[in-house]
Amino acid sequence: MYYFYWLPVGTDVRVRTTPWVTLSIVLTNLFVHGVFLASRGDAGTLYALAFKAAQPTVATALASLFLHAGFLHLVGNLVFLSVFGPPLEARLGPARFLIAYLACGWLSNLAQAAAILAWWPELVSVPIVGASGAISGLMGLFLVRLYFARLRFVSVTLLYFQGIAKPAAFSLPSIVGIGLWLALTLAYQFAGVASETAYIAHLSGALFGVVFGLVMGLAPEARLERHLAMGSRYAERGEWFAALGEYESYLAKAPADPEALAQAARLQRVTHQEGQSAVRFREAIRQYLRQGDTRSACDLYEEMRRLLGGEVVLPSGDQLRVARGLEELGRPSEASRAYEAYGKRYADRHLGTLAMLKSADIQRRVLNNPGRARYIYEELARRPLSGDVEAIVRDRLAASERAVERLHRGAA
């Protein structure tokens, strides 16, 4: 006897936010199931809350989404929800995601009830419970919004008579994985396998999910994000020019995405397009600063400096904001270097002089590096300065020289 069990366990798409709605649905399902376990399976209450074709109501159609026939039924649904929920919630937003989830579940229960009334009237009083219709709706939405993704699966092949149990892990394109699931569901429906399972709810839920995805305009978003996914896959395989082409296509429609700009800059560096790489790095940093993400801007500035070498300088305002950001983030060495780069690039400006002073002060007071501070003060002293500024520079230069002498005497 041969059995093959498979279960999705993840996707290759990024989730950048905490999926609060998905977590809330998971916890609500667990709480409701725990309450019924604590009440030792109150069948009367469960039956009253469950959706039935003979007595279809909006309230029971929604309540049934949080009721399950048993622990395995619950766990199976929550596994699917945990795979498909977070990436969709991150892209649809909490409100649209919750509405789509509940609507697919409600409509799929109505579809199951209609099928029972039409073809299996003897089942009109059998309760319909479970979140399968809603989760099937998420799978339909996934086909529209994230059709380019890959799904990760685990499987177990059982050969009972031979005593063999073989686990495996594999991945499939989402269209193939979900398509196989739909095909099996359809086959089970016609074959009458596990007839107590609401296969019509599964199939109709997926259909409603596809319809909702198209109505919400998710297809254009999907085509755009596909460029990022393909670019990432090409880059992982070392196909740099193909990857860069995908990012270029994406940026043609979303030119202000700092992460895509940064990735394109890295690819241009790898393909020896240093000039274009610098332009893209600078634009990515500017976009991070506009978004108020100073940490990412500072990190990318340092990455740009390492990859491109030399004196990396941003436009005036951006360079100062990055220098201040590095200082506020507790990275004094990098901040001093950024201030110094500004001071050298914009030497003819008053702010350039102040930036050099700031750089030297960080070296002297924070990093306890009077030698480096002296070098910067000496460079400043060679510039034409106003009387007050020149006096400050001379005074701090003298203090640095004394500190260097003390270090030398201590070393001796």
Give the ranges of each region predicted by the language model.
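Start-of-helix register in tetratricopeptide repeats
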Residues: 225, 242, 259, 279, ...
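TPR repeat positional signature
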Residues: 227-228, 261, 281, 301, ...
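Structural motif corresponding to the intra-repeat A-B loop/turn of tetratricopeptide repeats
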Residues: 237, 271, 291, 329, ...
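Structural register within alpha-helical repeat arrays
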Residues: 230, 264, 283-284, 322, ...
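A detector for small-residue-rich transmembrane helices and their helix-helix packing motifs
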Residues: 1-251, 259-267, 276, 283
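Short solvent-exposed coil/turn linkers within tandem alpha-helical repeat scaffolds
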Residues: 250-257, 290-291, 307-314, 342-352, ...
